[in-house]
Amino acid sequence: MINSDISEQLALMQLSDSFFPTGSFTFSHGLETLVQTGKIQSQPEILYFLQILLRNKVGVSDVVALIHSYRGCKNGDIEAVRVADRMLFVQTAIAKNRETQRQSGRALLMVASSTWQDERLKTLNIDAVSGNIHCLHPVIFGAVTSVVGLDERNAVLAFLHGLVTNILGAAIRLGILGHIQAQQILLQLVPDIEAVWSTAVSMNLEQMWSCTPFIDIAQMQHPKLAHKLFAN
């Protein structure tokens, strides 16, 4: 018999690992623009960038939609997953962000459906093909983590860990951060990640918001860069 606690922890590690093929490692969330324009060049600046992104955008929009998708899927209410998907799509103002969220969400759903056999994932696949859902990555992540048996908090932590490590990986590839510095930042972000969880867990979908104009402008300017390593 498989120990359920061990199974959950292994699923958490599997889903938060960059080895899991969703293409999220190709996203810089505006960091590439800010580096190329000289606005971010140091460890403290990257830390601040991540803190603002977590507290003023991801934590009060993406994570909220993730949690409601998780709860809906856990209760067998796929319509709740669809609602979370629609609400987050409206909340995501930048077209390129919507596109990349859909791409990684569809990739996640495809890989998860091939790895874990579950009727709820099959239904979401049908929805994706028929256009009933946008398939945004945070929403699909919430549904998948519910299916594989993670508890709600661990689902959020897995998502945030994956997001942060992908951005830190982008900073390393852009040449402005070393591996040891990245680990230091990851540790420094623990209070911010805890705060995101504490805030998002009690929010409803109508309360989602974001206020990161500096990052939003950088993301909108990204397509104009002469040379790009990342998709956004």
Swiss-Prot record:
Major site of localization recorded for this protein: cytoplasm
Q: Which Gene3D superfamilies match?
A: Urease accessory protein UreF
Q: What Pfam families does the record point to? A: UreF
The answer to whether UniProt assigns keyword Cytoplasm to this entry is yes
Against InterPro entries, the record matches this protein to: UreF, UreF_sf
One GO MF term: nickel cation binding
User: What Gene Ontology cellular-component terms does the record carry?
Assistant: cytoplasm
Q: Where in the cell is it found?
A: Cytoplasm
Spell out the family assignment given in the record's similarity comment: Belongs to the UreF family.
- Subunit text: UreD, UreF and UreG form a complex that acts as a GTP-hydrolysis-dependent molecular chaperone, activating the urease apoprotein by helping to assemble the nickel containing metallocenter of UreC. The UreE protein probably delivers the nickel.
Protein name in the entry: Urease accessory protein UreF
Natural source organism: Trichodesmium erythraeum (strain IMS101)
Instruction: Name the gene that codes for it.
Output: ureF
